[in-house]
A protein has these predicted regions:
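Polytopic transmembrane helical bundles with strong interfacial aromatic enrichment
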Residues: 1-160
Length: 160
């Protein structure tokens, strides 16, 4: 299931969803927290963060399938390093989903005018920012190591 899509490694396709969705959803969640009129749309942020977590899981599984297919001894250490870093991204994605769910539960109101207490708002903002920054930093780190694994030698050979 996570191996190939139309004869190509699924990992090469799925990682783009992670690299786009995880940072996007952290920004969207912060925006929904900051804008009172948008808070009623927080369930969409929760759903988006769930999709980002699912994409992260698919990237992790497809990466393991791809690593199993590669038998180049020169590539193995770089791929192993990438896999070692990438295995933790799912925890950041799940944390972002859980925080968006908690924030939605904290900030939802029964009436149409979204009002919240300052402590709830401050807690929501701090949680959202902290997890979002951590998730984005780790996404960058994983993406950078993956890009280096795939492209470093190819690009180096064009500089000669």
């Amino acid at each position: 299931m996570f191996d190939l899509v139309n004869g190509l490694p699924a990992h090469a396709l799925v990682v783009h969803a992670v690299v786009a969705l995880l940072p996007l959803m952290s920004v969207v969640t912060v925006a929904f927290v900051l804008r009172p009129r948008w808070r009623r749309e927080l369930p969409w942020a929760v759903l988006g963060n769930l999709l980002a977590a699912a994409a992260t899981y698919a990237a992790m599984e497809s990466g393991e399938k791809l690593q199993g297919r590669l038998s180049n001894p020169d590539f193995e250490p770089v791929a192993q390093d990438h896999g070692d870093i990438a295995q933790y991204l799912i925890y950041f994605a799940l944390a972002q989903f859980v925080v968006s769910l908690i924030v939605w539960l904290l900030l939802r109101t029964r009436d149409e005018a979204p009002r919240t207490s300052t402590p709830k708002l401050a807690t929501s903002l701090v949680l959202t920012l902290a997890v979002g920054v951590a998730a984005n930093a780790w996404t960058y780190r994983v993406g950078d190591s993956g890009a280096e694994a795939v492209w470093k030698d190819t690009i180096a050979s064009t500089n000669q």
